[in-house]
Swiss-Prot record:
The modification Phosphothreonine is found at T1238. Tyrosine-protein kinase that acts as a cell-surface receptor for VEGFA, VEGFC and VEGFD. Plays an essential role in the regulation of angiogenesis, vascular development, vascular permeability, and embryonic hematopoiesis. Promotes proliferation, survival, migration and differentiation of endothelial cells. Promotes reorganization of the actin cytoskeleton. Isoforms lacking a transmembrane domain, such as isoform 2 and isoform 3, may function as decoy receptors for VEGFA, VEGFC and/or VEGFD. SUPFAM superfamilies: Immunoglobulin, Protein kinase-like (PK-like). This is Vascular endothelial growth factor receptor 2. Residues 46-110, 141-207, 224-320, 328-414, 421-548, 551-660, 667-753 form the Ig-like C2-type domain.
Amino acid sequence: MQSKVLLAVALWLCVETRAASVGLPSVSLDLPRLSIQKDILTIKANTTLQITCRGQRDLDWLWPNNQSGSEQRVEVTECSDGLFCKTLTIPKVIGNDTGAYKCFYRETDLASVIYVYVQDYRSPFIASVSDQHGVVYITENKNKTVVIPCLGSISNLNVSLCARYPEKRFVPDGNRISWDSKKGFTIPSYMISYAGMVFCEAKINDESYQSIMYIVVVVGYRIYDVVLSPSHGIELSVGEKLVLNCTARTELNVGIDFNWEYPSSKHQHKKLVNRDLKTQSGSEMKKFLSTLTIDGVTRSDQGLYTCAASSGLMTKKNSTFVRVHEKPFVAFGSGMESLVEATVGERVRIPAKYLGYPPPEIKWYKNGIPLESNHTIKAGHVLTIMEVSERDTGNYTVILTNPISKEKQSHVVSLVVYVPPQIGEKSLISPVDSYQYGTTQTLTCTVYAIPPPHHIHWYWQLEEECANEPSQAVSVTNPYPCEEWRSVEDFQGGNKIEVNKNQFALIEGKNKTVSTLVIQAANVSALYKCEAVNKVGRGERVISFHVTRGPEITLQPDMQPTEQESVSLWCTADRSTFENLTWYKLGPQPLPIHVGELPTPVCKNLDTLWKLNATMFSNSTNDILIMELKNASLQDQGDYVCLAQDRKTKKRHCVVRQLTVLERVAPTITGNLENQTTSIGESIEVSCTASGNPPPQIMWFKDNETLVEDSGIVLKDGNRNLTIRRVRKEDEGLYTCQACSVLGCAKVEAFFIIEGAQEKTNLEIIILVGTAVIAMFFWLLLVIILRTVKRANGGELKTGYLSIVMDPDELPLDEHCERLPYDASKWEFPRDRLKLGKPLGRGAFGQVIEADAFGIDKTATCRTVAVKMLKEGATHSEHRALMSELKILIHIGHHLNVVNLLGACTKPGGPLMVIVEFCKFGNLSTYLRSKRNEFVPYKTKGARFRQGKDYVGAIPVDLKRRLDSITSSQSSASSGFVEEKSLSDVEEEEAPEDLYKDFLTLEHLICYSFQVAKGMEFLASRKCIHRDLAARNILLSEKNVVKICDFGLARDIYKDPDYVRKGDARLPLKWMAPETIFDRVYTIQSDVWSFGVLLWEIFSLGASPYPGVKIDEEFCRRLKEGTRMRAPDYTTPEMYQTMLDCWHGEPSQRPTFSELVEHLGNLLQANAQQDGKDYIVLPISETLSMEEDSGLSLPTSPVSCMEEEEVCDPKFHYDNTAGISQYLQNSKRKSRPVSVKTFEDIPLEEPEVKVIPDDNQTDSGMVLASEELKTLEDRTKLSPSFGGMVPSKSRESVASEGSNQTSGYQSGYHSDDTDTTVYSSEEAELLKLIEIGVQTGSTAQILQPDSGTTLSSPPV
């Protein structure tokens, strides 16, 4: 048994020894065990230290290497009681024996360590072997620390560091300065960089003990740069010698180590030499140089060579590429050009791109002649021509020669120099040319250009249109800063012109192009411009064509004067040609013959005559000397001369005008009128000729009453000729012709007798009817053409995606608005012409005020407007928001169905104000709710409604014409204060009336819907997204015109019940499309969804959408799943289908606004055609039925006749079904769903009274204002207007009756009055109606709301 144990031990020892011999880790070795189980052992000096270590394999000891002579005193012995056990013994230990004692397995890292303090109070510091040098190296880096190795034999010494010189003491601060008995004294290096030496000092029992002295040596580490020489472009051929120098520049006291990396690092012929370079005294840097030399390079030596210099704390590198060629060669590079084009005056560079080693010799030749460098040409690797000219055109040859192999390569480059058009006449110095009036003139334009000009164009402009203004910059090369030049082909208002074809001529040895312009008659002064263009530029010449004429005399008024009349003689002369105008009178007797200009001798002797008094006037071109003769007499007759002197030649020019004064003569009538007898239907023509001086005025009388022109009475030639066409019996009577002047009257008379009976021939009727038909045809044709042209022009407008809401892919709105322009000259309106009135509404930071604007348009002196402005204390961002809305309104432009901008007040000195149209009837939602008791769904032929008796409606006057007018309303690029399109253009015969006094019909609802669609179509065409389309944002103006408002200004959504809180934001969830609710995506298609909700509001007469539905996450989920609102109470099947199309879950499947305009226009047209035929009627005596499967509340007959998409109930018949079906086919609408999930009604419960919380927000997102609650209570006292159309209160939230009761201007038209209101639920309202019905003994039927019927009463 004992032998087996010994064998096992031997095998284990063998395995362990083998593992140790090959360096393998032992199998699960434990750490050596020390006899003293402590990390730190403290003993006193002169005692014996003995520690035993036991393990599982061979052990060794390590002890401190201090200056203690422990090598002779330490004894390590094997234990007697163990195989792997060693004992360390040190007798009479001293302080320098302090340190770490380590027992470890041989050839492994497994060890046990104990730190032993030998307390020796006479020598508390340990002197290690490394301290013999006594040197501490530091750097001046503030982030570096240095350790002074003054170790201690006592762990808790109070140690400080002393520095010399100057002397300074450092005490540990627990932060960056500390002392550790095992490590030493740690301190930032910069704190002792000044010192020459340092030492540690400790106090024990009031005695000081010092460590050895340490010399402080400050060393540097910064390397400024590493430079390789040569740095780049190193090329060699096989066998040549490579020498690379690497220079490192450092600060002083730095040691550098160089390290090279290159392809053949084991090259046998390489040699490295490192040395320090001498630096000048006083220099603050040091240089080190390392040279790499390779003798006889080979192809394998090609590659990247990197030199790295390191100071220990910093390393920098630099690299270069060495290319080794097999042999010398030369060749041209692939990018060498063969053709170079340049323009005169440019700097031309033709590089010689080559590949070769060594660099070749380069020679340049032009057309075979060697080129030498001079002040204009530099011939080298790059041929440079400083200012190229025409003579530099030619072939340039470059020849490359290898200096070793003498190989040659050549390449030819063709240089073509272009010349921009130069007009020869432009260099001539000539004054402004004057040309005689009425003469034929020829203007010439001679052009030299390479290549010849593509074309030469002539332009012109009137001289006065191009007058220099002080603000215009005028230069010598462009003395006429004209802008609006016109082609000579359009000489309207100018001289008649003929342009000859261009001709080519050899002039001064150059091929030039000559263009001539022939002015057939010089009538007006103008500027003519000749413009020539070729591929490199253009040239132009402006010719001043000043037309002058001699002095002219004109008479004002332009007729011979009569005695006692005033007359003026005007002498007009060109002010640039003539001066010193003077009037003379030759004598009372006229010249024997009439002459226009006096002979020169006579003109020279006029100084002997008396000068006449006259007044001088001047304009931009002429001087006018005016001589006035007041109350002319016969003595004023004679020849009058105007003298003018030529400014240049001082030659006199005299023109004469003979003045004749006529004698006054009383009126007389030549001939007499004769009595006439004429049959009915014929025509009468008579003449009455009168003479006299002054000429008399002729008037006609019938039976002593003034005869005026009528449809059958025509007066011509100054009333001298009277024509009566198709005479009637009443044309019979006494006709008088009377001629009167200041000298009296003369008259003649005649009696006209009319015979025959009063009748109209068939021919006349046919002619009248035919003429009317032809006129109407041409009128309709003209309207179609104009509308087509407008539509084509409108389509060409290109605008960015900026408006009320921007496309998310575009720039943010504020950035876009910063880029939008504001033209103050077009839109600025003076504040002093604006009279502010009562407030219309207030918002979070904005308010809207009614005001009177004086002179804001051309149609009226004063106009009522709405002024948007900020409240006091508005911030800069709020100011920018209002300015952004102003710029957006300018960008959108003018449209009939949009609240249009009229002006703005933006200048400093007052508040920022935006002036828009005023809509007196407020918003559409409030208006529809106010008209519920006056709603009549059908029309009769009655002219007016009879209030309190019959609810019948009349078709509005000329609906078709109004529809066409509204449909054709286009955007106008409004500039300045837009002149409001007069609504009289839309309805000329419809007088203004208060809309609140009229009854509301189904036609009105369709018309409102059509107009909103038309306005949104316009906004969509302007790339605008409204984002908040609702009835509260639709304003009602006069004559039933609706306008879209709310362009993003200061809506007080925190107090608006239509805005539901979602997170930290309030959103109008009831009007928002699913993609907007869930993905925050706003598009034109999301506006179409909102338009569908707006239709529901209109056809429910202002009810709030989703009545009785709690607006929460469940509502949003059901909406996304396809649940929709049931049909409103006053709709038709077609309109409800349109709503469902707008609510399609897929945005791309919803109709566009253009399709909606077409569809609603067809419905409106069909409604208009029912006059006298069929009428759009909703059931009166029958109740509204509910289809069980669809959930739709549609007015229909008791027997449903709906099949698929078609409604055949005659009550809903439309004449224009073809147009409707076409819309259904062309649009994206799908078939009518068999079943539509709808939100359920509110169940009947006990009335519940709730108090609105502070934020005015209920679960449904609606509140009921106090004033509207009173209105609701008053409404419960009224009987229903008619049975079939009474809204089912189980399907309409009572709170919606008064939601958002504002004046209509949503953008800031909000009230800040937020009194706490009481909310009455729909159940309470329904119970009130039932209670009233019971109390009044009404025959109303009380039906369950879930049975598909509604509460109804007999019609009034």
